[in-house]
Regions:
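RNase H-like DDE/DDD metal-dependent nuclease/strand-transfer catalytic core used by mobile genetic elements
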Residues: 1-110, 114
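C-terminal domain-tail junction helix/linker
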Residues: 62-66, 88-163
Length: 163
C-alpha cells in the first residue's frame, strides 16, 4: 500500500500471494498513473524491504522525480504511518473475514480501501476522511502528533496543488 502522508489517503495498493517486488510495483504504478507526471519533488518513505530497494522499484521512483527515503533502523516507529495503516487494515477493517480465493481477497481489499478513503474519519486530519483532506490546501490542524513528529520536532505537511 502507498499512503499519502498529508491526507492519509491510500493512493496505491496491490494484493499478492508473496513478497515479490511485482506487487509493490503495481501499487506504485497505480499512484504514478493518478499523479499523471506530477510526482516531482515528492518523497517516497519505506522500510528497507528488498521490494523497495530493488533496482526496478528504485528506478521507477527516480524516473518519476520522486526522492527516496528509507528507515535507518529496524524500529517500526521510523515507519509508523505504514505500520498503522497495515494494522488498521488487518485488525480493524478485515478482522475475522475468511476468503476462499485471491479474487475474494482483492474485491474485499478494494471495498475496504474505498471505505477507508471515503468514509472513515481520522483524528490526525481533523476528523476528515482522507479524500476530504486530499482536497485541502495548506496545513491541516492535527488533533495529535506522531512519534516521528515528537522525535524530530514539529513537521508540517503541506498539500501543494499544481495549477
Amino acid at each position: 500500500m502507498i499512503l499519502d502522508s498529508y491526507s492519509k489517503e491510500i493512493v496505491g495498493w496491490c494484493v499478492g500471494d508473496s513478497l515479490r517486488t511485482e506487487y509493490p510495483l503495481e501499487a506504485l504504478k497505480m499512484e504514478l498513473k493518478r499523479l499523471d507526471g506530477k510526482g516531482h519533488n515528492l518523497i517516497h518513505h519505506s522500510d528497507r524491504g528488498t521490494q523497495y530497494a530493488s533496482s526496478e522499484y528504485v528506478r521507477l521512483l527516480r524516473d518519476n522525480g520522486i526522492r527516496i527515503s528509507m528507515t535507518e533502523t529496524g524500529d517500526p516507529r521510523d515507519n509508523a504511518q505504514a505500520e498503522r495503516i497495515n494494522n488498521t487494515m488487518k485488525n480493524e477493517l478485515l478482522k475475522g473475514k475468511t476468503f476462499t480465493s485471491m479474487e475474494e481477497v482483492i474485491n474485499e481489499v478494494a471495498k475496504t480501501v474505498n471505505f477507508y478513503n471515503n468514509r472513515r474519519p481520522h483524528m490526525s486530519i481533523n476528523n476528515m476522511t482522507p479524500v476530504q483532506a486530499a482536497a485541502c490546501v495548506g496545513e491541516i490542524t492535527k488533533k495529535w502528533h506522531s512519534y516521528q513528529e515528537s522525535k524530530v520536532g514539529n513537521i508540517i505537511y503541506l498539500h501543494i496543488v499544481e495549477l
